[in-house]
């Protein structure tokens, strides 16, 4: 996975100062190794057209449903602040995500950004256990 954590800070300069090097890096990775690109704060529409990368990890600012039926793989987009919810709400969220994307072969569940220190690991566990029980 290529993490371009600050790519969203660039506007018109993104292609010249970031994407050009990402493409060069991706082209030098053997073809049997999948490449996933995460660019925080950048909508991936323009990136899709400018790269051969076929898997994108979305941050929480992008709309996953806008991309789900394209010929790319989508990962991420779950807002980790939702882990502040109570256990019942977390189980509901896991069920909603599972039901919405269970028939999509191009979706990988993942977070849209990192966990902050104030998130209770037990809450993450509740969510993941529910999601896992639904998918098995």
Label every PLM stretch briefly.
Residues 1-136:
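Active-site loop segments of alpha/beta catalytic cores
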